[in-house]
Amino acid sequence: MGEWPVQCFKAYDIRGLANGDGSGELTPQFAYRLGRAMAKYLGCKRFAVGRDIRDSSPALTAELIRGLTDSGVSVLDLGIVSTGCVYHACWTLPVEGGVMVTASHLPMPTHNGFKMCRGTLPLAGEEIQELKQVFLDGNFADGSGEVIDNPHMDNYLKAIID
């Protein structure tokens, strides 16, 4: 892809048009490159990833995870969860960061996005702009991470109830 949709890198997340057929601004190719860029920028070796129910979320999540694992990051795949569940996973699981594939309050099914954490803190502001530069520059490290199925919603709900 010659031109990437840099306008999707916002102040607190990455958001844009994403259709279930793989078209739009946020494509599976974008998600793969984002996974590669996140691995390089954050330097994490273990990451939690969750997604919402939007039509585009399965493909975006699969390619994000592939980008992370191709860079040597092991991924705890949380499955379909809420954003709060991903944040909880970052606090309670042995991970160094997390990503939620969601466009939050933006319209379904035309939008999607990525909310990212380093450790327990959401990426924001200058960090997202630095990530954008890594995304654009390329030069990603190769590695071999694994995907671990790790449903976390029950643990999250139990923590809320307790």
Describe the role of every protein-language-model region.
Residues 1-64, 70-71, 146-162:
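An N-terminal, well-structured beta->alpha segment
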Residues 11-21, 29, 81-84, 89, ...:
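Surface-exposed loop/turn and secondary-structure junction residues enriched for glycine/proline
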Residues 20-24, 59, 90, 98, ...:
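Generic alpha-helix signal with a bias toward terminal, lower-confidence helices
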Residues 39, 44-121:
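Ferredoxin-reductase
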Residues 112-162:
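Gly/Ser/Thr-enriched, mixed-charge loops and adjacent short helices
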